[in-house]
């Protein structure tokens, strides 16, 4: 089955056909590193890491680029408030970002370019736009001449005249048209700066991504992604810059994830209801946070609450319990082959359904439903008196593979298994010695730890409740 992606540009699902067979060029807008990220900032890395993982699962070679904006008005403001320089603050929060998203199961991008390390190509990009008549210098600033780009507004599906009607020129801006936007900002006294043909200054936000995407992925890319809030003006402006320069389509597929609400209220710093990732992963397993985020389709908003998180945790633990019980059953399983094909064939259907969900615009919500169905199917098999090692291992491998696609892992608990086996052996010895009080105490202690014993003709079996 082919993959279909909802393209913000066309507002419809389209069959995914990359520019080069089995290769994907993917650019995801990264953070401005002036503070710790909150859970809203963390949704794009988790969502698009999962997209990348699934594409790789399907055999694509994914070139995944995600940038750091390490010089910006917000960084300059933070530096002034803290009495530190911009590079020091940027470095601190880049390190914090990696700690947070790694905990959340995100792989590093193929490249994590920084604005400050690519200033030469950014300045060259701006100069080329000036040379082509798409940009102009004004008292040390450089602005993009929006009216020169015929397709402006095509991503956000807005007419340029409607956009102009709602725009205005702010005090201190030296642009010709309210819709024009800054490509280069002249440095103010005491600000960090770089030398350029227009004097000392630094780049505007939008030009950075256009320049770095072109440097690392070429004139045209397959997927450009980010949060819904970036579609306008950031991504709209990227299209205007890149397509004006190259004359080629910038990105074939535009993907945007939805917002996060906190207790049914939009999350925002002004309301003070945002949750920092480095705080919440101290309270909850980071894998639970990721599983929760993926339990909703990426384009839909998420309502974040402790109640919903706990409910999701219950579901995740059911899957993990099934996995642990399967691991435990391997030792007591045999090489029998009766009914193997039936169970293996049914198991394969769950993988097919999982992949069908992911093929449909990376619908992780429906994919997770199939993960639950697979776990329930495995639980039915575990009720069999005799189980096959081949089938048990197939369940384990399939659960691990589907978890891996979602960026999740099963926690290894071999040591705990050995502890349980040792206690069971101690209970067997107690029963042989007719010390039934000790045997009952061991059984009850294990039950308190959610370990259920079952005495059978073949010996004592155990499972996690």
Swiss-Prot record:
Cofactor(s) the protein requires to work: Zn(2+)
Family recorded in the similarity comment: Belongs to the class-I aminoacyl-tRNA synthetase family.
Keywords for this protein: Aminoacyl-tRNA synthetase, ATP-binding, Cytoplasm, Ligase, Metal-binding, Nucleotide-binding, Phosphoprotein, Protein biosynthesis, Zinc
Residues annotated to bind Zn(2+): 29, 209, 234, 238
Binding-site list for ATP: 269
Keyword rRNA processing: no
First-listed, main subcellular location of the protein, grouped into a coarse class: cytoplasm
Residue stretches in coiled coil: none
Taxonomic source organism: Bacillus cytotoxicus (strain DSM 22905 / CIP 110041 / 391-98 / NVH 391-98)
Entry's localization field: Cytoplasm
Subunit and partners: Monomer.
Chain positions with Phosphoserine modification: 270
GO molecular function per UniProt: ATP binding; cysteine-tRNA ligase activity; zinc ion binding
Sequence motif 'KMSKS' region, residues: 266-270
Catalytic activity: tRNA(Cys) + L-cysteine + ATP = L-cysteinyl-tRNA(Cys) + AMP + diphosphate
GO cellular component, one term: cytosol
Keyword Isomerase: no
Position of sequence motif 'HIGH' region: 31-41
Stated name of the protein: Cysteine--tRNA ligase
Free-text comment on the cofactor: Binds 1 zinc ion per subunit.
Top-rank taxon, per record: Bacteria
GO terms classed as biological process: cysteinyl-tRNA aminoacylation
Gene3D superfamilies tied to this protein: Cysteine-tRNA ligase, C-terminal anti-codon recognition domain, HUPs
InterPro entries cross-referenced by the UniProt entry: Cys-tRNA-ligase, Cys-tRNA-synt_Ia_DALR, Cys-tRNA/MSH_ligase, CysS_C, Rossmann-like_a/b/a_fold, tRNA-synt_1_cat_dom, tRNAsynth_Ia_anticodon-bd
Enzyme Commission code(s) on record: 6.1.1.16
Major enzyme class: ligase
């Amino acid at each position: 089955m082919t993959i279909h992606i909802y393209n913000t540009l066309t507002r419809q699902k389209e069959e995914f056909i990359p520019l080069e067979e089995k290769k994907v060029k993917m650019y995801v807008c990264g953070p401005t590193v002036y503070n710790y990220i909150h859970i809203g900032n963390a949704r794009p890395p988790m969502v698009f890491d999962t997209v990348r993982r699934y594409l790789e699962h399907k055999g694509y070679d994914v070139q995944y680029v995600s940038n750091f904006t390490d010089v910006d008005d917000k960084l300059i403001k933070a530096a002034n408030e803290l009495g530190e320089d911009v590079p020091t603050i940027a470095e601190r929060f880049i390190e914090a970002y990696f700690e947070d998203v790694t905990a959340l199961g995100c792989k590093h991008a193929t490249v994590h370019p920084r604005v400050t390390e690519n200033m030469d190509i950014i300045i060259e990009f701006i100069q080329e736009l000036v040379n082509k008549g798409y940009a102009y210098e004004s008292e040390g600033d450089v602005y993009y001449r929006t009216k020169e780009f015929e397709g402006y507004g095509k991503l956000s599906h807005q007419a340029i005249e409607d956009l102009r009607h709602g725009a205005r020129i702010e005090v201190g801006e030296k642009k010709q048209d309210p819709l024009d936007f800054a490509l280069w900002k002249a440095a103010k006294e005491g600000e960090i700066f770089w030398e350029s043909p227009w004097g000392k200054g630094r780049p505007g936000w939008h030009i950075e991504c256009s320049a770095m995407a072109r440097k690392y992925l070429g004139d045209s890319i397959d997927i450009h992604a980010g949060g819904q809030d970036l579609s306008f003006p950031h991504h709209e402006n990227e299209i205007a810059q890149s397509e004006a320069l190259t004359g080629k389509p910038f990105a074939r597929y535009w993907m945007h994830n939805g917002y996060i609400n906190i207790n049914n209220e939009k999350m925002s710093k002004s309301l003070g209801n945002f949750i920092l990732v480095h705080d919440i992963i101290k309270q909850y397993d980071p894998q639970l946070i990721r599983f929760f985020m993926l339990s909703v389709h990426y384009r839909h908003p998420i309502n974040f609450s402790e109640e919903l998180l706990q409910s999701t945790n219950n579901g995740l633990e059911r899957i993990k319990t099934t996995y642990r019980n399967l691991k435990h059953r391997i030792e007591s399983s045999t090489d029998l082959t009766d009914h193997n094909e039936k169970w293996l064939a049914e198991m394969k259907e769950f993988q097919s359904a999982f992949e069908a969900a992911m093929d449909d615009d990376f619908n992780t919500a429906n994919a997770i439903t199939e993960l639950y169905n697979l776990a329930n199917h495995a639980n039915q098999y575990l009720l069999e008196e005799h189980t096959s090692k081949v089938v048990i291992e197939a369940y384990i491998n399939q659960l691990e593979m589907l978890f891996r696609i979602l960026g999740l892992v099963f926690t290894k608990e071999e040591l705990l298994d050995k502890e349980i086996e040792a206690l069971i052996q101690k209970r067997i010895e107690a029963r042989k010695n007719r010390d039934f009080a000790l045997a009952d105490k061991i059984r009850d202690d294990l039950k308190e730890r959610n370990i259920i014993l079952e005495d059978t003709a073949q010996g004592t079996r155990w499972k996690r409740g």
